[in-house]
Amino acid sequence: MRFLAYFGHLNIDVLISVDSIPREGSVNVKDLRPRFGGTAGNFAIVAQKFRIPFDLYSAVGMKTHREYLAMIESMGINTGHVEKFEDESGPICYIATDGKKQVSFMHQGAMEKWKPQLADEYEYVHFSTGPNYLDMAKSIRSKIIFDPSQEIHKYSKDELKKFHEISYMSIFNDHEYRVFREMTGLSSPKVTTIVTNGERGSSLFMDGKKYDFPAIPSSGDTVGAGDSFRAGLYLALYNRRSIEKGMIYGTIIAHHVIDDGIENFSLNMEDLERETENYRRMFTKRS
């Protein structure tokens, strides 16, 4: 049995800097910068640096993603389970920002044609962004991690409730968790649940208790921080450590990704363990 299947986006974000966001008409573009990311892509780049074994499941259009695939393959990331559509583009997100507000235009492209299938048996299967994965989740025996991210509205009330109940763990950010509770009517989670809340840190709901993990002050771009946090969680699970230890790993890794950027992330296992001990002494009584 393999360790982890990770479902999500290999997204190209095109960042467009403008002086102001117009209601209509046109404005001058000050800067145009593509960035390789997505829920699965960001996770994969960080997880690979810690040699966490995983299989990436996603779909891309080869009109746009050849360079992206070449980059992650050069890092040793296996793309054998990434479905490649030769005559398709995407997924691409165009993000225009004036520094205060932003507007996004999402082209799903290949993801809309993808019919995902699991190719092997895994201990963990992580379902993040993409199509509605509920039918697949109901048919497998793996430990399911439900992580709908910004696509939580893709699921109905009953689907959200069912996916959560059959999962080993659910992961939301603070906004998604509010949406989840409002849609399902659940006042508290039924299974182990992680809620991330940016600079306020994260919370673990487990066995009827809540454990809070403060964030480490950071300054930088937060894009990819949440996906990097998940790499820390799986690093702990792969090494048969506790979920609480994974929360600390994730907090520290996300801090470094925010400060340094994913492309410059260089934290090694020795330094991570040292920083984990420092974090435990400062913030927690249990890990």
UniProtKB/Swiss-Prot annotation:
InterPro entries: Myo_inos_IolC-like_sf, NucKin, PfkB_dom, Ribokinase-like. Its cofactor is Mg(2+); Co(2+). The active site is at residue 227. Belongs to the carbohydrate kinase PfkB family. It comes from Thermoplasma acidophilum (strain ATCC 25905 / DSM 1728 / JCM 9062 / NBRC 15155 / AMRC-C165). This is Nucleoside kinase. The keyword GTP-binding applies. Can use Mg(2+) and Co(2+) with equal efficiency in vitro, and to a lesser extent, Mn(2+), but not Ni(2+). It comes from the Archaea. Homodimer. PANTHER family: RIBOKINASE, SUGAR KINASE. It catalyses: adenosine + ATP = AMP + ADP + H(+); cytidine + ATP = CMP + ADP + H(+); guanosine + ATP = GMP + ADP + H(+); inosine + ATP = IMP + ADP + H(+).
